[in-house]
């Protein structure tokens, strides 16, 4: 009897660290390519040519922006994939597919949309530096700086011969964190035009990074989640490819996809102590976003987006 009681208590302890049911589920109009939280709103990029803005506090969609159809070599009416979205001071940036496998940068302000042609069609990500400047990252690991008024590139540099994986920017828009196929993460000081730090984290390609409050987490092919916090780099061996990662706004809680079931582990970014596991049941996770320290959003290449209460 004592043995059975002990096993019951042990199982309760184990499963208490797992969350199996989300508090809320919403559905985008098309498969989700990524999500990002900006000023408390969830910006959802889809492969159906839409940017869908959801207000978590009000539990409703504020707006759905639908891009025009594009032409391909097989059809004159295809929906463009939205590659990424950013927003600053009421101005929105949308990096989208264009006609015949091109890329188009759209700037939306006061309800008006304008497009900017880009010479480099290998652009993978775009982020605001300020109201008039944008950083563009190409898959060939070149970073370009674009003046929105003139539409001209005013500066650029190449990081390495390795392909670019991902790019994020600090809250003050002063530092770019750039992840590469080589497994390294570069921290570029925009004002000083120099690398402040280079971290050699992974032995192979990096899938995803998050960068909040000076803390960085990366996930890669080598089944490692790397966390740089308080000047120290720590590594977690997950045993599976780490496709998606995320951080709370203060950087104190780190999250990463941990296995083939798309479970998401949440840990203390300094001690690496486990906080909980989210049993998402989704396909491969492509973004993990913290609404707050207590609420996390997970998405995958599907319409379903899940909200989780973690504390």
Residue ranges and their predicted role:
Residues 21-27, 60-75, 111-117, 152-158, ...:
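A short beta-strand motif characteristic of beta-propeller blades
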Residues 24-49:
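Beta-strand-rich domains and repeat architectures in extracellular enzymes and scaffolds
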Residues 35, 83-85, 125-126, 167, ...:
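Hydrophobic core register within WD40 beta-propeller blades
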Residues 37-39, 87-89, 129-131, 171-172, ...:
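Residue-level detector of Asp-centered blade-edge/turn motifs that repeat once per structural unit
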Residues 42, 92-93, 134-135, 176, ...:
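Hydrophobic beta-strand positions that form the internal "hydrophobic ladder"
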Residues 46-47, 97-99, 137-140, 179-182, ...:
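Conserved strand-to-loop turn within each blade of WD40 beta-propeller repeats
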Residues 52, 103-106, 144, 186, ...:
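WD40 beta-propeller blade core
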Residues 56-59, 107-111, 147-151, 189-193, ...:
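Short loop/turn segments that connect beta-strands within beta-propeller blades
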């Amino acid at each position: 009897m004592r043995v059975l009681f002990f096993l019951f208590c042990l199982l309760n302890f184990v499963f208490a660290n797992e969350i199996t049911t989300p508090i809320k589920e919403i559905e985008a109009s098309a498969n989700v390519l990524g999500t990002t939280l900006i000023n408390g709103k969830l910006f959802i990029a889809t492969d159906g040519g839409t940017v869908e803005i959801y207000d978590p506090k009000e539990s409703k969609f504020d707006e759905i922006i639908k891009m025009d159809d594009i032409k391909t070599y097989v059809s004159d009416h295809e929906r463009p994939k939205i590659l990424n979205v950013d927003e600053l001071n009421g101005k929105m940036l949308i990096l989208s597919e264009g006609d015949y496998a091109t890329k188009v940068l759209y700037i939306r302000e006061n309800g008006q949309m304008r497009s900017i042609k880009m010479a480099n069609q290998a652009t993978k990500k775009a982020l605001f530096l300020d109201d008039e400047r944008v950083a563009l990252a190409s898959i060939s690991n070149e970073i370009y700086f674009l003046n929105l008024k003139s539409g001209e590139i005013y500066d650029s540099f190449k990081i390495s011969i390795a392909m670019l994986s991902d790019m994020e920017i600090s809250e003050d828009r002063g530092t770019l964190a750039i992840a590469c196929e080589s497994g390294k993460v570069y921290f570029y000081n925009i004002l000083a035009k120099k690398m402040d730090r280079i971290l050699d984290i992974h032995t192979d390609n990096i899938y995803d990074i998050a960068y909040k409050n000076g803390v960085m987490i990366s996930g890669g092919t080598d089944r490692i989640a790397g966390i740089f916090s308080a000047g120290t780099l720590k590594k977690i061996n997950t045993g599976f490819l780490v496709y998606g990662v995320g951080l709370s706004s203060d950087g104190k809680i780190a999250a990463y996809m941990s296995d083939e079931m798309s479970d998401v582990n949440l840990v203390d970014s300094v001690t690496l102590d486990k906080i909980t596991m989210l049993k998402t049941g989704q396909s491969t996770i492509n973004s993990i976003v913290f609404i707050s320290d207590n609420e996390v959003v997970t998405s995958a290449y599907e319409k379903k987006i899940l909200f989780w209460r973690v504390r």
